[in-house]
């Protein structure tokens, strides 16, 4: 405190006015009660320049002053001035108390804010640091608005061009949000900040707030009067409707949507509201669910499963989130279904639509509309019977015939009871045969994986699955989901084998077969991931045909004669033992071969050394022979000389 008092006298004697700009840190650190406005602009300037924390750890705008000034005691005034300037800069946006705390702002990874529900949604910046964030809006003493840049300390009357560019960018992104595919994102970060959008700001840019896991329901969204709290599945603070029958506790499933619209980490709740619900489809466009016919966003995005019937026919699926159909009118909502084993990547747009009665994706999209038209035209028929028809008619052929009758003659041209009997006959025909589900039969109540057009393989979730237990409201048999099994390449054939092995026509809970979709293009692509659900009471799992499908497509005549049971004895053998044996034999052969080769190499070296010795001995002998010849010549000369002398 003594040093603090001495510094205070130095700063107040005019030295601060001369050298304040060159030493902003000194002015920032020791600005006190007598100088509430001296370090005011320097708070603005040094907040960005001297911030030690990276931008993805704390919010730049909502940095709490307590983090920086907590070591000294006389800075209450500076804190108030700083928070007041932050509020003035944002044009009077009032912050929620959670937003100004350090533990909350450390959870965010983008520069977005969360405002009170009564105000407009606050702005979203595109990057972790945007140059438009330096500008703030103030009101001058004459009452006019002016804009101040805290980094360059420039004031001007007109709106800064960074703001105009950002508004233009966000408007364009809002226009393109319906048709655009998601960019490659950091999906872990997206799980952490489950973002929820408010799609009803008319004419303004699309703004959303990143919510952390500790947010309360009132500041997760900027709600308008038309929003309904029941449509947002909030994490850890869900607003359950009064008749919520089933809750599925599953691990977070990522929705990489262009404008994030659903909360990925939420436990999904089935809500039976008897009122028209607003819901967000996978591309962020909000669609009113009163429409009984498929709107323009329905073909581009493969609408949800068939809606489960009210009353005793309560079908609860372990992986899907079906909305219950109300008694007054069917509301086909556009909420995308999420399975625990498949991440719905961006829906495939129907750029080239195949013929109507051959593309099973169109069958899937037309199901809610067909239900609605059935109920509108046959108001005296029980809606559960219609749902039974559409549930039981899972084969391609029967669904083709039903939809063909719908499209040509209308629903009044045939009898509903005949359809029910036909579907029951189909299901009883295929029930005794214990065949595994085909990958492309049009099952109206099973989850599927969307296939991104950029990546032609199905995107599967890498999060390990917990066993999903869902308890239906009527029957008490839980269903457990078995883990994912890869299947071989499956071709996208138009007509498939009529298999309804798991379907019961009675009011027991239907065990949904997780038959997954390939892309809308009719071409062979890598096979989907199968998840098979079975009743936990019987604990029987439908056998997966791991490599049953041949590479070529089955013609209808071949599909009629094809039987999985005939080739089941050669499928799925445990290969671990054979692989271990083969690897052991390979290693042994390798070791024996190396030993043998090393022996041969040593023998070769020995023989080469012997050859070298022989060569050396041969040269020595030659040298000796030459030497001896030389000696013989010399001796003969000496003989001759001696003979002459004698």
Curated annotation (Swiss-Prot):
GO terms for cellular component: nuclear speck; spliceosomal complex. The keyword Transmembrane helix does not apply. The modification Phosphothreonine is found at residues 293, 471. Residues 38-50, 158-174, 182-191, 226-239 have a biased composition (Basic and acidic residues). Phosphorylated on tyrosine residues. Signal peptide: none annotated. This is WW domain-containing adapter protein with coiled-coil. It comes from Mus musculus (Mouse). It comes from the Eukaryota. Residues 617-643 form a coiled coil. CDD domains: WW. Residues 103-122, 252-267, 332-351, 511-524 have a biased composition (Low complexity). The modification Phosphoserine is found at residues 53, 131, 142, 225, 446, 511, 523, 525. Pfam families: WW. PANTHER family: WW DOMAIN-CONTAINING ADAPTER PROTEIN WITH COILED-COIL. SUPFAM superfamilies: WW domain. Acts as a linker between gene transcription and histone H2B monoubiquitination at 'Lys-120' (H2BK120ub1). Interacts with the RNA polymerase II transcriptional machinery via its WW domain and with RNF20-RNF40 via its coiled coil region, thereby linking and regulating H2BK120ub1 and gene transcription. Regulates the cell-cycle checkpoint activation in response to DNA damage. Positive regulator of amino acid starvation-induced autophagy. Also acts as a negative regulator of basal autophagy. One of its GO terms (molecular function) is RNA polymerase II complex binding.
């Amino acid at each position: 405190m003594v040093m603090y008092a001495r510094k205070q006298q130095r700063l107040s004697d005019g030295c601060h006015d001369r050298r304040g700009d060159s030493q902003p840190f000194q002015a920032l650190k020791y600005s006190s009660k007598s100088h509430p406005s001296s370090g005011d602009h320097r708070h603005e300037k040094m907040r960005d320049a001297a911030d030690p924390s990276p931008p993805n750890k704390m919010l730049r705008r909502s940095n709490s002053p307590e983090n920086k000034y907590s070591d000294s005691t006389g800075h209450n005034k500076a804190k108030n001035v700083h928070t007041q300037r932050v509020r003035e800069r944002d044009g009077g946006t009032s912050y929620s108390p959670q937003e100004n705390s350090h533990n909350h702002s450390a959870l965010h990874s983008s520069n977005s804010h969360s405002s009170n529900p009564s105000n407009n949604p606050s702005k979203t910046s595109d990057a972790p640091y945007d140059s438009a964030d330096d500008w703030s809006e103030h009101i001058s003493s004459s009452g006019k608005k002016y804009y101040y840049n805290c980094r360059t300390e420039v004031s001007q009357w007109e709106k800064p061009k960074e703001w105009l560019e950002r508004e233009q960018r966000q408007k364009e992104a809002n226009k393109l949000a319906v048709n655009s595919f998601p960019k490659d994102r950091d999906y872990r970060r997206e799980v952490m900040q489950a973002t929820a959008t408010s799609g009803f700001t008319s004419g303004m840019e699309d703004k959303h707030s990143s919510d952390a896991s500790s947010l309360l329901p009132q500041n997760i969204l900027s709600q308008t009067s038309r929003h309904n709290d029941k449509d947002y599945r909030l994490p850890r603070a869900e607003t359950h409707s009064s008749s919520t029958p089933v809750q599925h506790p599953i691990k977070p499933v990522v929705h990489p949507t262009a404008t994030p619209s659903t909360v990925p980490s939420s436990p999904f709740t089935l809500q039976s509201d008897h009122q028209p619900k607003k819901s967000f489809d996978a591309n962020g466009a909000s669609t009113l669910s009163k429409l009984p016919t498929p709107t323009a966003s329905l073909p581009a995005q493969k609408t949800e499963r068939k809606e489960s019937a009210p009353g005793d026919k309560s079908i609860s699926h372990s992986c899907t989130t079906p909305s219950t159909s109300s008694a007054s009118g069917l509301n086909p909502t556009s909420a995308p279904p999420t399975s625990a084993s498949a991440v719905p990547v961006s829906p495939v747009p129907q750029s080239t639509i195949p013929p109507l009665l051959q593309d099973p994706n169109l069958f899937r999209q037309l199901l809610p509309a067909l239900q609605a038209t059935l109920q509108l035209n046959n108001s005296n028929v029980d809606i559960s019977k219609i749902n039974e028809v559409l549930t039981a008619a899972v084969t391609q052929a029967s669904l083709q015939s039903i939809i063909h009758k719908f499209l040509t003659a209308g629903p009044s041209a045939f009898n509903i009871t005949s359809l029910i009997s036909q579907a029951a006959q189909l299901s009883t025909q295929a029930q005794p045969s214990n065949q595994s589900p085909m990958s492309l039969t049009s099952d109206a109540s099973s989850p599927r994986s969307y296939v991104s057009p950029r990546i032609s393989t199905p995107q599967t979730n890498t999060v390990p699955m917990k066993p999903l237990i869902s308890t239906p409201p009527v029957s008490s048999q839980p269903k457990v989901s078995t883990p994912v099994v890869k299947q071989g390449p499956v071709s996208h054939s138009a007509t498939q084998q009529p298999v309804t092995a798991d379907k019961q026509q009675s009011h027991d809970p239907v065990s949904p077969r997780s038959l997954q979709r390939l892309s809308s293009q009719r071409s062979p692509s890598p096979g989907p991931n199968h998840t098979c659900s079975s009743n936990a009471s019987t604990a029987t799992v439908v056998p997966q045909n791991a490599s049953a499908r041949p590479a070529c497509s089955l013609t209808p005549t071949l599909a009629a004669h094809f039987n999985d049971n005939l080739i089941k004895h050669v499928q799925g053998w445990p290969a671990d033992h054979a692989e271990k044996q083969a690897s052991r034999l390979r290693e042994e052969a390798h070791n024996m071969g190396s030993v043998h080769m090393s022996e041969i190499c040593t023998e070769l070296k020995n023989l080469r050394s012997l050859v070298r010795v022989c060569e050396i001995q041969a040269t020595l002998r030659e040298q000796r022979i030459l030497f001896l010849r030389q000696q013989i010549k010399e001796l003969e000369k000496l003989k001759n000389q001696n003979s002459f002398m004698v």
